[in-house]
Amino acid sequence: MNLIQQLEQEEIARLGKTIPEFAPGDTVVVQVKVKEGNRERLQAFEGVVIAKRNRGLNSSFIVRKISSGEGVERTFQAYSPLVASIEVKRRGDVRRAKLYYLRERSGKSARIKEKLVRKVKAA
C-alpha cells in the first residue's frame, strides 16, 4: 500500500463515518445538511442509486428521483460533512453497474425489481 492510500485510510478512520452497504438499483434516503441563513436543518433526498464510484475518501454516488414529474439527479460525496446519514430503504435487483438508461425512461418502464434476500438456514 503506497503512502497516499495509507493517508486516505487514516483520514477515513479519523472521520469515523459508517456508510451502509448499498449498490446501484437500491433506493436510499440521504439526509443532507442545509444551511439557510443562520440556521441549519436536515433535508431528505430519497431516490434510486444510479451510479456508485468507489475511490476511498473520494467515493461518490448519484441518486435519481422524480420530483413533480421532473427527473432530479444529485451527486453526493460519501465522506462529505454535508451528508448526515444514508439509509437503505429497498434493495434493487439490476444487472448493470451504471443505470444511466433510467434517464430516458419514465413511469412503469423505469421501475426496478426488488431483490429478494435469501434466509440462511441455521445448522
Swiss-Prot record:
Biological processes, Gene Ontology terms: translation
Transmembrane segments: none
Organism: Laribacter hongkongensis (strain HLHK9)
HAMAP family: Ribosomal_bL19 (MF_00402)
GO-annotated cellular components: cytosolic large ribosomal subunit
Lineage of origin: Bacteria, Pseudomonadati, Pseudomonadota, Betaproteobacteria, Neisseriales
Free-text function comment from the UniProt entry: This protein is located at the 30S-50S ribosomal subunit interface and may play a role in the structure and function of the aminoacyl-tRNA binding site.
Keyword annotations from UniProtKB, A to Z: Ribonucleoprotein, Ribosomal protein
GO molecular function, one term: structural constituent of ribosome
Record family assignment: Belongs to the bacterial ribosomal protein bL19 family.
Domain of life: Bacteria
Protein name per its UniProtKB record: Large ribosomal subunit protein bL19
